[in-house]
Amino acid sequence: MTQAPTPTADTVRRLVRALLEEGGTAGGPGPEVRPVARSGTPATWWVGARHVLRLATDRETTLRRARELRLRDLVRPHVPVAVPTSVAHGEWSPGLVYTLDTKLPGGTAEEHDVSAVGEADLAGLLRGLREVPPRQAETLGVPRVAPRSLEALRRMAVAVAERLARADEFDPTRLHQLTPPGAAQLAAQPGSAVLVHHALRGEHLVVSADGRVRGVLDWTGAVLGDPAEDIAGLALAVGSGAAVRAATLAGYGARPCLRGLWLARCDTVLRLAEDLDARTAGPRDAEALTLPRTRLGRAWEAILLERVTEFREEDEDGPDEKA
């Protein structure tokens, strides 16, 4: 298999120029292009002030991007927030696709705090994802994914927590709140699979300066699976309190809310330990730890729900979902 080309500014300019010529608007130097991320392979580019160009750099990403175009059309009528619209798509290199999307106005959840009204927007998002017919999503190629074992995740988090304690990053006794029986009670319930965005991180939530959630980006990782995964993602993006309030407003009961909370908590412990192991003494490494530390703090916010919940067999787990 040949090596995929690395996108460059010249690559992007040539592609944008060709698109402008097709649209009959060529002329002049064309819009400014610049990579969105400062590091890594520059696969996402700003094109002027109004568009975003995303370039697939491997076959798997190509398949996911092609599926995303159809999935966004399926999701759009069900959710109260904006979903990106593609104005052009095709191949930028043999077998590798591009999508040129309209930029959604606003910042991210890493730049703006989500307000109470924004939490209602998130509730509408979770509710809308639950309403997307699973069979229609499957026909688009959205995969079904089995729920993760919370007990296995808990054990892995416990195993690395002492390393974080020695680095003065985390108090391992906090994990004692989740016991093996507690993890078993928070197992995903049969028949609860819904469409899950699966990457509701702060950078994928478009938030306006007034705290409203205006849109959701990057649907390439969407699956049919455990709704607690999106609650966990929101806990990392906006904090456990806001995530649980949004999920409760969307109709989810205590069990999926607490499951999402503990998925997020264990994930952040594991991620911070991984990032600490990989660091050196340089200033960039210190900066790279800022976001994992912030997400850990958000996930470990104390919430009232976990203090007042006692599970029984007849507990209501959430909406009556059909997968």
Regions found by a protein language model. Give the residues of each.
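An alpha-helical support segment within catalytic cores of ATP-dependent transferases
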Residues: 7-28, 91-92, 105, 115, ...
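Short helix-capping segments at alpha-helix termini
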Residues: 24-26, 77-80, 168, 241
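ATP-binding pocket architecture of kinase catalytic cores
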Residues: 30-149
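Helix-rich C-terminal or lid/interface subdomains of diverse kinases
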Residues: 41, 109, 232-323
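Conserved catalytic motifs of the protein kinase core domain
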Residues: 48, 96, 191-193, 212
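Active-site Asp-x-Gly
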Residues: 60-62, 193-196, 201-257, 261
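Conserved strand-to-helix beginnings and helix N-cap segments that scaffold or border functional pockets
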Residues: 65-66, 228, 286
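Short strand-connecting beta-turns/loops that link adjacent beta-strands
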Residues: 91-95, 210-212, 265
